[in-house]
């Protein structure tokens, strides 16, 4: 029965979002269909985050699980039905009166997420300091951006072994220990406050690894009291530019209270995207999103996108792969010991390359084998042979010779070019 339940759960996972249109490929994609072990659509090869899949509840469960057993349990609520932790997103609704000719109408703006602060004016200021295309207003480009970053920055398969493909019991245990470690040592959520509000905390408090705050020694507090009044200049830890005292700033507790960021500067140090919902991972003086923090700790399989917990894996083309996942990107045949060609950083077997990706020779109009030498000029290619790379007029072999290109034709001389014009 337990095995049946697992199989059913896996099946439901593959049904999720089935048929959703691709926002990137548009009508070229027949609709989302999850690949069996890759985290992409079987039809268009784009990720789930590129499709119009309704995942609000699923994403709230994912973030809720991330915050489970951490100091951020105030941000989650457990469902009475199954006890699953759910992320309590702070949704902000603003109403603005709009003057009309006869009466006043109300314009309502809903933010799908906002900083969980009591001062709504501060939260509103925070939103206004973000680029407009990244403000999570419901139904906008910014809301779509947030949804995409939730999927990209916080992959469910980076924290939940049940979302991974065929882990061994040993790998499951290692992953659980890894997740427990990063929750206690790196995970954090930014705070939005005015810089002056944090001065007292930076002088009277000290940061304790693990997330707790405690009062510093009274002597230290007395020594720093004068510094509190002297400090009037605030600068962003990221861009080093000055910050206005009345503007909201973001603090990351794990970084310490002496560091602050502009709202638009609170980004991952690797991908430079806004840290979604201000969820960060702190390591060696840098902010990371969940994905890139994990990448700094473990190898990630370029095939299935999962972290590798096995001691045995392969490296090819500056990427890491589970042994069973070093496969052709087109047909999924294993490539160990086989000839392959990299196409857009993805390995493709020789038959699939010739069939789907090979350039066509302008001379014989056949696909050019990846192992065969060729001549390329602009977007045109020829077999580097005496049979194909010839003058389009007199058929003189042009290998090693000067030539005159005209669209898909080549000529050995001005005379030959004139004869064909």
Swiss-Prot record:
Keyword Disulfide bond on entry: no
Residues in the signal sequence: none
GO biological process, one term: negative regulation of cell population proliferation
Protein localization: Cytoplasm; Cell junction, Focal adhesion
Main location: cytoplasm
Composition bias, Basic and acidic residues: 155-164
Zinc keyword on record: yes
General function of this protein: Scaffold protein that may play a role in cell adhesion, cell spreading and in the reorganization of the actin cytoskeleton. Plays a role in the regulation of cell proliferation. May act as a tumor suppressor.
Similarity field: Belongs to the prickle / espinas / testin family.
Protein known as: Testin
Source organism of this protein record: Canis lupus familiaris (Dog)
